[in-house]
Amino acid sequence: MSNNVYERNRIKNDRYESGVIPYAKMGYWDANYSVKDTDLLALFRLTPQPGVDPVEAAAAVAGESSTATWTVVWTDLLTACDVYRAKAYRVDPVPSAADQYFAYIAYECDLFEEGSLANMTASIIGNVFGFKAVAALRLEDMRIPYAYLKTFQGPATGIIVERERLDTFGRPLLGATVKPKLGLSGKNYGRVVYEGLRGGIDFLKDDENINSQPFMRWRERFLYCMEGINRASAASGEVKGSYLNVTAATMEEMYERADYAKAVGSVIVMIDLVIGYTAIQSMAIWARKNDMILHLHRAGNSTYARQKNHGINFRVICKWMRMAGVDHIHAGTVVGKLEGDPLMVKGFYDVLRETELSINLPQGIFFEMDWASLRKCCPVASGGIHCGQMHQLVYYLGDDVVLQFGGGTIGHPDGIQAGATANRVALEAMILARNEGRDYVSEGPEILRDIAKLCGPLKTALDLWKGITFNYTSTDTADFVETATSNP
């Protein structure tokens, strides 16, 4: 008997021995595995239970997220099980973290239904996060193969087409969230939209929890918002919009609201992350068919994305949402009130905006990845930002971003229109300084003070918020370098 035949028989006898055997012995660990271009790769941060070998824990995750159950089953012999088993092929200790390991796992592409985010995630995150062999588990990064990416639509509109529709180039887009989130009547809501747009920003926005409550039903809100948009557009000569939140209890209701938004002239609609992956993909398909921009509010993400040792890293959510087809997603500000280490946020933005990804461990990007010509998704920076931070925002986030000032517009002492004007003037001044070759990062405060001499609303805003910062240490920081989380 040849050595190859003997080895195959040995593996078969060992692997299909009745009872409970280690996952690594069942074929879910292969240190010599050669990764294929068509493999989907996942990187997990493992914290094994005391006494559990890291390799066995990695094999257990591979098994439970692909074909395994807790015991050997003879029906494996009826499948191409050696092909369909996920393979953990590498385990590395996490730098400066005791008892944590990076586990690399490869999945055959045929394990996943084409174009279905729900099916892919049912495997990758379906059962394993409650598995007893691991004390904690976090999905840090994924490489989606080119062949599988081509089965997804990608962003409904994309950054390039959105700029063409708005006829706005060479600067970040400006937005603001209507405040207070809840309680306004439709007429007052529409007035906020008008004042903000008339002051110079590009978009107003519903917040995540404004849908159709007793104090303001959705039709009323849509109509008053569109009146404000149309008046502001006519007065300014600029294309304007307001993110009309069509999130609802059922898909039928969401389609009805989205169709109505289009019928009354909106260029953009909004949904919340909490509606689920299938609903998000469905709305993205609707948006592509109807030439609408689709904004996604990441409501709920920090319940599983913020903690460093358990959950899902937000960069993975960014990849999934670009695949699903949204045009905008909130992705952090660095300088605002929400979680956001500078390197981590840069990684999120690269995932959304680049056509190809290179390995960048300080930013948490572990895999090279070609986006297969899927359109770019525009990051949105919102949460505790104001015009006095404009130099930092432009430096960290670049041009292809929506800078969304909610309280930083609505909270201006002289009114909403003055707040919007302050933000627009601050942005235009910073872009001009950058284009002139000035060191706008270090000179930013001086640039703002100089232009404020010519703009009363900006001077008032700078005086009001000059001491406001949110320099808390981020929870999610880089594993491979020391990371400064304070702002320059």
UniProtKB/Swiss-Prot annotation:
It comes from the Eukaryota. Its EC number is 4.1.1.39. The active site is at residues 179, 297. GO terms for molecular function: magnesium ion binding; monooxygenase activity; ribulose-bisphosphate carboxylase activity. It catalyses: 2 (2R)-3-phosphoglycerate + 2 H(+) = D-ribulose 1,5-bisphosphate + CO2 + H2O; D-ribulose 1,5-bisphosphate + O2 = 2-phosphoglycolate + (2R)-3-phosphoglycerate + 2 H(+). It is found in: Plastid, Chloroplast. Signal peptide: none annotated. The modification N6-carboxylysine is found at residue 205. Binds 1 Mg(2+) ion per subunit. InterPro entries: RuBisCO, RuBisCo_large_chain_AS, RuBisCO_lsu_C, RuBisCO_lsu_C_sf, RuBisCO_lsu_fd_N, RuBisCO_lsu_N_sf, RuBisCO_lsuI. One of its GO terms (biological process) is reductive pentose-phosphate cycle. The record marks 337 as: Transition state stabilizer. GO terms for cellular component: chloroplast. Its main location: plastid. Mg(2+) binds at residues 205, 207-208. Its cofactor is Mg(2+). Pfam families: RuBisCO_large, RuBisCO_large_N. Gene3D superfamilies: Ribulose bisphosphate carboxylase, large subunit, C-terminal domain (3.20.20.110), RuBisCO large subunit, N-terminal domain (3.30.70.150). Keywords: Calvin cycle, Carbon dioxide fixation, Chloroplast, Lyase, Magnesium, Metal-binding, Monooxygenase, Oxidoreductase, Photorespiration, Photosynthesis, Plastid. Substrate binds at residues 127, 177, 181, 298, 330, 382. NCBIfam families: PRK04208.1. The basic functional RuBisCO is composed of a large chain homodimer in a 'head-to-tail' conformation. In form I RuBisCO this homodimer is arranged in a barrel-like tetramer with the small subunits forming a tetrameric 'cap' on each end of the 'barrel'. RuBisCO catalyzes two reactions: the carboxylation of D-ribulose 1,5-bisphosphate, the primary event in carbon dioxide fixation, as well as the oxidative fragmentation of the pentose substrate in the photorespiration process. Both reactions occur simultaneously and in competition at the same active site. Belongs to the RuBisCO large chain family. Type I subfamily. Heterohexadecamer of 8 large chains and 8 small chains. This is Ribulose bisphosphate carboxylase large chain. It comes from Olisthodiscus luteus (Marine phytoflagellate). The gene is rbcL.
